[in-house]
């Protein structure tokens, strides 16, 4: 065995990919270990599924669960998982996915070159999962895929994501269950919002967005949320704790303004004080 290929997880029959694990029982065990929003994502049958999640909410584990489920439902076909960049495939996806496969004793074979890919060995047969970077999304053009999973899609430039999305959907033309699943912490009004959050998107019947809060994950350190609350402003907390779509680039001061606390009708004696005036040169009306 070369360092570019390896086998993992309870290959009890050395040199063989045989497994007697009951696939339905395996998927039931995986689902039982998920918290409710993860289960909602796992159970979703829409063609396009989004997961908008706070930090530490468990979105990567949700994607790992979905990757195994879709692989089991598409025996003999090919799926793909995508991270924003190639290093993130190695640093995030491969580490977490292999731990997941080992935890559930799912036999697999990994090939690192020329591009990383996993083959999962089920009782009914094999299923392949390609690992690709979203920055090089065009590499999947020409493939017939059953499913595509994308992690941290809001980190990708909206120009690239918007161009790649319809092309990737065009690859979903094989297998028994064809799905596009994307998970990310929302970064303002980017791809997740445009695809799931607009009024037009909400009227579509082919897609659904699931929101997952940081506090939904019972496995986080007890002080994790408290530390975030102590260091993030309200807008960032709405996005990074609750998975909400908020403006993270403009209007940061305005959202904290309240007339009761910041406006007064009394005029203190300031005759001897220097006069300081602040002006906000807005796009439309100027405020002083």
Task: Give the label of every model feature segment.
Residues 151-155:
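Walker B catalytic acidic pair
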Residues 217-285:
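ATPase catalytic-site recognition across NTP-hydrolyzing enzymes
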Residues 56:
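Walker A (P-loop) phosphate-binding loop of P-loop NTPases
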Residues 77-89:
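Conserved RecA-like ASCE P-loop NTPase motor core of nucleic-acid helicases/translocases
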Residues 1-47:
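Pre-P-loop entry segment of helicase/translocase ATPase cores
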Residues 60-74:
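Walker A/P-loop NTP-binding motif
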Residues 88-146, 245:
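Inter-Walker segment of RecA-like/P-loop motor cores
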Residues 157-231:
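ASCE P-loop NTPase helicase motor core
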């Amino acid at each position: 065995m070369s360092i570019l290929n390896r086998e993992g997880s309870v290959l009890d029959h050395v040199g063989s990919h045989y497994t007697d694990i009951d696939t339905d029982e395996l998927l039931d065990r995986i689902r039982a270990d998920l918290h409710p929003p993860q289960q909602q994502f796992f159970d979703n049958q829409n063609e396009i599924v989004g997961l908008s999640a706070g930090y530490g909410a468990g979105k990567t584990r949700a994607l790992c669960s979905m990757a195994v489920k879709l692989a089991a439902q598409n025996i003999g076909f090919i799926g793909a998982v995508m991270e924003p960049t190639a290093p993130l495939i190695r640093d995030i996806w491969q580490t977490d996915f292999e731990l997941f496969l080992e935890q559930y004793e799912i036999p697999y074979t990994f090939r690192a070159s020329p591009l990383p890919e996993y083959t999962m060995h089920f009782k009914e047969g094999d299923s392949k999962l390609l690992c690709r970077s979203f920055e090089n999304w065009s590499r999947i053009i020409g493939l017939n895929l059953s499913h595509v999973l994308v992690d941290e899609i809001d980190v990708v430039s909206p120009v690239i994501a918007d161009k790649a999305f319809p092309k990737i959907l065009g690859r979903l033309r094989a297998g028994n269950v064809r799905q596009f699943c994307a998970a990310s912490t929302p970064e303002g009004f980017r791809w997740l919002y445009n695809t799931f959050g607009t009024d037009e998107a909400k009227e579509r019947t082919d897609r659904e967005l699931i929101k997952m809060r940081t506090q939904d994950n019972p496995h986080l350190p007890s002080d994790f949320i408290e530390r975030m609350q102590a260091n993030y402003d309200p807008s960032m907390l709405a996005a990074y704790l609750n998975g909400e779509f908020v403006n993270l680039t403009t209007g940061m001061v305005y959202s904290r303004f309240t007339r009761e606390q910041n406006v007064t009708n009394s005029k203190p004696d300031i005759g001897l004080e220097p006069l300081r005036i602040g002006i906000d040169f807005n796009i439309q009306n100027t405020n002083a």
